[in-house]
Amino acid sequence: MAVVASRCTGLLLPDLGASLAGFRRRRSTPASSLSFRPRRARRRLGSLSCIAPPDSAEPQTDEPAAKDDSTEDKAEASSASQDAGNPTFPNKDLSRRIALASTIGAVGLFAYQRLDFGGVSLKDLAANATPYEEALSNGKPTVVEFYADWCEVCRELAPDVYKVEQQYKDRVNFVMLNVDNTKWEQELDEFGVEGIPHFAFLDKEGNEEGNVVGRLPKQYFLDNVVALASGEPTVPHARVVGQFSSAESRKVHQVADPRSHG
């Protein structure tokens, strides 16, 4: 009996076709010709083979993934083109920052327009000044400053004048006379004021020892005040003229309170 190989498991199976063919030949042979020779039938082993079944899990190709990537790239390109065509607007946080910066800039501009240098303005000096009539009668030396609110040099020097004033206000009078006030016409003529700021330095009897006009170093002003406070007969800087504003540019107006020394 022949043996065949199974396709899937590799088991040896008998060859039924060959066995049936032999059986038919034996029946067709005449009985007279039959010889009974005992003979062992040989088994023929068929060739062993195993045909592996086709793998049902076939590897998938990369075409779908490639198509997906291509689709995503097209979508991104389309989105980018739309963004390029549409204007971008700042978010709310950026808008708040811009508004805050604008507010700070406006406050800074307002402070600059006041020219409140060093935190001190001409109005501060005028408010703390000694009235002119009192200064002439209290027996102290006096510094008289002729100024105007529109005088830029006057505003620049205000912090330096204030610092010196705070040091010597107990020994020296500091008087502020606004040239726009018609009340001081006589004093303008008496001291020969042609430019401002004009600083006149008077001894304790009210006699002028010197004057300084316009922008000057802080040390000049301090030296003259120290000389007055020390009772010296003269001041070291008696005739100094720097950059000043012309008194001819003054805006004359009558103040409501004639007692005001501003």
UniProtKB/Swiss-Prot annotation:
Transit peptide, residues from-to: 1-54
UniProt entry tagged with the keyword Disulfide bond: yes
Naturally occurring in which organism (per UniProt): Oryza sativa subsp. japonica
Catalytic center residues: C151 (nucleophile), C154 (nucleophile)
Disulfide bonds: C151-C154
Function as written in the Swiss-Prot or TrEMBL entry: Probable thiol-disulfide oxidoreductase that may participate in various redox reactions in the chloroplast.
GO molecular function, one term: oxidoreductase activity, acting on a sulfur group of donors, disulfide as acceptor
Protein name: Thioredoxin-like protein HCF164, chloroplastic
Primary subcellular site in the record, as a coarse category: plastid
Ranges where the Thioredoxin domain occurs: 78-230
InterPro entries in alphabetical order: Thioredoxin-like_sf, Thioredoxin_domain, TxlA/HCF164
Region (Disordered): 47-90
Coiled coil spans: none
GO cellular component terms listed in the entry, alphabetical order: chloroplast thylakoid membrane
GO terms under biological process: cytochrome b6f complex assembly
Localization, UniProt: Plastid, Chloroplast
Bias-annotated ranges (Polar residues): 78-89
Segments of skewed composition (Basic and acidic residues): 64-76
Family: Belongs to the thioredoxin family.
Keyword Oxidoreductase annotated: no
Alphabetized UniProt keyword annotations: Chloroplast, Disulfide bond, Electron transport, Plastid, Redox-active center, Transit peptide, Transport
